[in-house]
Design a protein with these regions (language model features):
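Catalytic centers of nucleases
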Residues: 1-49
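Acidic metal-coordinating catalytic centers involved in nucleic-acid phosphodiester chemistry
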Residues: 28-175
Length: 175
């Protein structure tokens, strides 16, 4: 169920983890007839404005966009933003190939932030570091893989255990 009000705009659900982090989840199973997400598709769905708004609304806010479709280099850019020591190091060492540079420039445009302004650059990196563009495969192979992992932890019929775990997660909101 999508949360009501301003906080629920552009998200399927919100969770708070044990560390007090508030996680906003947007899930999209498809992108019309496209087999991946282009930056323009995400812009069309207002993902950049919504993620920025949620992340900037307070400390410990994270935005997750989850889909079985690929994102190009966007998820890699966000991972790199989480592993830098300074804004200048990020530009020098993490934005180091043409594809990543192009995606970074698109993010700069879509988030309406300017890398030449040191405070806006820090804000852009902060937003990217708090965004997760997760690729989640669906299908029979993934189900078998998940049940294989379950079999290494639990004893019993793995499909039954998977169903019980899914039911528990849905009933308690523990994701």
């Amino acid at each position: 169920v999508e949360p009501l009000g301003i906080e629920g705009e552009g998200v399927e659900f919100i969770s708070t983890d044990a560390h007090g982090n508030q996680n906003y989840y947007q899930c999209k199973a498809s992108n019309t007839t496209h087999s991946s997400w282009a930056m323009s598709d995400l812009q069309h769905h207002d993902v950049f404005n919504r993620s920025k708004k949620h992340i900037e609304s307070g400390d410990q806010k994270y935005y997750y966009f989850i889909s079985p479709l690929q994102y190009g280099e966007l998820d890699e850019l966000c991972k790199r933003a989480r592993t830098n020591s300074s804004a200048q190091d990020f530009l020098t060492y993490q934005i180091n190939n043409p594809k990543i540079k192009a995606v970074f420039s698109e993010c700069e445009k879509h988030y309406s932030l300017d890398r030449n302004n040191s405070q806006e650059l820090k804000n852009l990196i902060y937003i990217l570091a708090h965004c997760y563009f997760e690729h989640y495969s669906i299908g029979e192979e993934e189900r078998r893989d998940l049940e294989g992992r379950i079999g290494t932890i639990f004893t019993g019929k793995t499909s039954t255990i998977r169903n019980l775990l899914e039911q528990y997660a849905n009933d308690t909101g523990s994701f």
